[in-house]
């Protein structure tokens, strides 16, 4: 029998019989690897263990410890769930069921709604099917054969998918009596699906189109073992406890109202104070770094949006209004007014770089189905800046922004990850401009000394970019800072400066945000801190609590003194038990409760008590002011 040569990840070569599969290769390396293998990579493509090898292929064996393992496990768990649903609810029609970042889902068309009790039944049946150790097999059928197969099963959604693929052949995966249209790959048998949990039910339109039929989506998750699953479920419970929508109500920070409109935030006094603190912090930090604060109008003429390209490419996400028979666009971003500021004067190379910063409120039409508390809204404020500089200044400006981001993330206690997205196939601008911008971004990233990923071809059509994702207390990733080079707007708006040689040249433009949308960042902060904001960020830093009504006059004087000193303080002078008032303040996550009783009134002091129950020594009100100033001095 002839043999073929296979390249392994360590660079070694291995001879194996022609016609062998990836499973055969794993077995030839060792019994332990054969047992651990769940899939393979053939020339960089994730495939089943049953895939036949080719000569001179590069092969990697995927085990449960591999980064790609969860994708395969979760995809197979989605099929297992669909199989269980079909057995328990034969009338259900299956549609699509992919693996996603945190688990998997499957969409079903069924008249009767699924209930929480149904999820328990489905999960129990999944466990039985997994224990049955059914072999998962892949077949390649002609499209006509596949249409015949799924038509016979009454699965009209699968028939629609096959017809839309317009391919000569398709792959079908089977386990027991269940078959599904799928590219794979999958585990070799159902017994390899060992730890899973069904989580929730939601609605979803077929193919994401609101004009199509509403389906029922079941979400679940799966892991390699029960320990990992339990850890994830614990994090999930913790994320529910930290949910900013719940905490926003409980802490009286913000609300939404159908009478006002979907995705439009109403900030209550404490939420507005939190936002004000954050915005004041942003202004100070930008001024320290040489930015000029600017403000643009909320609406701009439609012709300006046409000139910028937004009308052509972004119109569906914009809101428009008519004023004196003139059409205006409500701004979805802040850049156009900044362009007009630049154009208001003839610029010299000596003026550059110019850094325009605006806490600009924008409006974007997001579909109702994707709105989510503060994290996805229709009206929001960005810490938006545009840097206009000479090409030779670009490298230094990018490094400055990355240092800015690093400083700010450290203040809030966030770790973060960075990604560089390079030129896509469809792009504008000449090669030299792209090379200059990409090299500047790459150089700045390397200069940080931190690791980063490169997403080849994932940049915007008008320039490369750096995306920065922060990691919160639950190790979740959130997009925040972005640094984006733009070759389009300087060209469209004919931005120029007079260079040292007297020639007019085009400046380089950088869009950048540090926190991103203020609303979204506050939502992330609420969940990161679980509402326990650090002292400098807390909308209420201290709560004065009296023991009896006799202490109210003294407490009123202390309240006024603290407010005059700039402390954000409130008073609870109700005729309630002290323990009740302290508990109320703790539930509101106020950092300090200042107890005032006979002893404090006689000695003209207050007794601070931290929200975790720890008491400080009694002190004069002015000493408490000094204490707060010292604790927050780095953020004022």
From Swiss-Prot:
Keywords: Aminoacyl-tRNA synthetase, ATP-binding, Cytoplasm, Ligase, Metal-binding, Nucleotide-binding, Protein biosynthesis, RNA-binding, tRNA-binding, Zinc. It is found in: Cytoplasm. One of its GO terms (cellular component) is cytosol. One of its GO terms (molecular function) is tRNA binding. Binds 1 zinc ion per subunit. Residues 243-534 are annotated as: Catalytic. InterPro entries: aa-tRNA-synt_IIb, aa-tRNA-synth_II, aa-tRNA-synth_II/BPL/LPL, Anticodon-bd, Anticodon-bd_dom_sf, Beta-grasp_dom_sf, TGS, TGS-like. Residues 1-63 form the TGS domain. Zn(2+) binds at residues 335, 386, 511. Its EC number is 6.1.1.3. The keyword Ligase applies. It catalyses: tRNA(Thr) + L-threonine + ATP = L-threonyl-tRNA(Thr) + AMP + diphosphate + H(+). Its main location: cytoplasm. Its cofactor is Zn(2+). GO terms for biological process: threonyl-tRNA aminoacylation. Belongs to the class-II aminoacyl-tRNA synthetase family. Homodimer. Catalyzes the attachment of threonine to tRNA(Thr) in a two-step reaction: L-threonine is first activated by ATP to form Thr-AMP and then transferred to the acceptor end of tRNA(Thr). Also edits incorrectly charged L-seryl-tRNA(Thr). This is Threonine--tRNA ligase. It comes from Pelobacter propionicus (strain DSM 2379 / NBRC 103807 / OttBd1). The gene is thrS.
């Amino acid at each position: 029998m002839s043999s073929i040569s296979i390249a392994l990840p360590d660079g070694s070569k291995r001879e194996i019989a022609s016609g062998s599969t990836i499973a055969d290769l794993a077995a030839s390396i060792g019994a332990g690897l054969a047992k651990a293998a769940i899939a393979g990579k053939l020339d960089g493509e994730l495939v089943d263990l049953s895939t036949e090898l080719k000569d001179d292929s590069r092969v990697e064996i995927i085990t449960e410890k591999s980064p790609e393992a969860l994708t395969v496990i979760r995809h197979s768990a989605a099929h297992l769930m669909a199989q269980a649903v079909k057995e328990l609810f034969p009338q259900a029609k299956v549609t699509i069921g992919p693996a996603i970042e945190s688990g998997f889902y499957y969409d079903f068309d069924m008249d009767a709604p699924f209930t929480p009790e149904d999820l328990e039944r489905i999960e129990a049946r999944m466990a039985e099917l997994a224990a049955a150790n059914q072999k998962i097999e892949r077949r390649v059928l002609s499209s006509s054969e596949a249409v015949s197969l799924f038509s016979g099963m009454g699965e009209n959604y699968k028939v629609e998918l096959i017809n839309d693929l317009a391919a000569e052949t398709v792959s079908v995966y089977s386990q027991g009596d269940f078959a599904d249209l799928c590219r794979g790959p999958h585990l070799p048998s159902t017994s390899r699906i060992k730890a899973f949990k069904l989580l929730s039910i939601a609605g979803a339109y077929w193919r994401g189109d609101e004009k199509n039929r509403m389906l029922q989506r079941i979400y679940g998750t799966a892991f390699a073992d029960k320990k990992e699953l339990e850890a994830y479920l614990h994090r999930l419970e913790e994320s529910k406890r930290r949910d900013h929508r719940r905490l926003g109500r409980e802490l009286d920070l913000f609300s939404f109202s159908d009478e006002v409109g979907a995705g439009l935030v109403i900030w209550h006094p404490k939420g507005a104070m939190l936002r004000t603190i954050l915005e004041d912090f942003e202004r100070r930090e930008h001024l320290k770094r040489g930015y000029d604060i600017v403000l643009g109008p909320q609406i701009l003429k439609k012709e300006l949006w046409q000139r910028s390209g937004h009308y052509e490419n972004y119109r569906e996400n914009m809101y428009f209004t008519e004023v004196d028979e003139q059409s205006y666009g409500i701004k979805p971003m802040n850049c156009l007014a900044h362009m007009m500021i630049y154009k208001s004067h003839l610029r010299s190379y000596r003026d550059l770089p110019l850094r325009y910063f605006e806490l600009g409120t924008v409006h974007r039409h997001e579909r109702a189905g994707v709105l989510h508390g503060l994290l996805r809204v229709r009206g929001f404020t960005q810490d938006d800046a545009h840097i206009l500089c000479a090409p030779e200044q670009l490298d230094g400006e990018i490094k400055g922004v990355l240092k800015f981001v690093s400083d700010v993330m450290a203040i809030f206690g966030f770790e973060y990850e960075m990604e560089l997205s390079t030129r896509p196939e469809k792009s504008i601008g000449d090669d030299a401009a792209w090379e200059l911008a990409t090299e500047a971004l790459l150089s700045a990233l390397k200069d940080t000394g931190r690791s980063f990923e490169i997403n080849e071809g994932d940049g915007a059509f008008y320039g490369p970019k750096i995306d920065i994702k922060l990691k919160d207390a639950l190790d979740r990733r959130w997009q925040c800072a972005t640094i984006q080079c733009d070759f389009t707007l300087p060209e469209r708006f004919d931005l120029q400066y007079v260079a040292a040689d007297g020639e007019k040249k085009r400046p380089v433009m950088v869009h950048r945000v540090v926190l991103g949308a203020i609303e979204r960042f506050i939502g992330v902060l609420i969940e990161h801190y679980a509402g326990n904001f650090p002292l400098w960020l807390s909308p209420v830093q201290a709560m004065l609590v009296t023991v009896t009504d006799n202490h109210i006059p003294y407490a009123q004087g202390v309240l006024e003194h603290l407010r005059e000193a700039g402390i954000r303080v409130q008073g609870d002078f109700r005729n309630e038990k002290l323990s009740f008032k302290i508990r109320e303040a703790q539930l509101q996550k106020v950092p300090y409760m200042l107890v005032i009783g006979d002893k404090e009134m006689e000695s003209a002091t207050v007794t601070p008590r931290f929200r975790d129950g720890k008491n400080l020594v009694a002190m004069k009100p002015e000493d408490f002011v000094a204490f707060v100033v010292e604790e927050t001095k780095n953020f004022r």
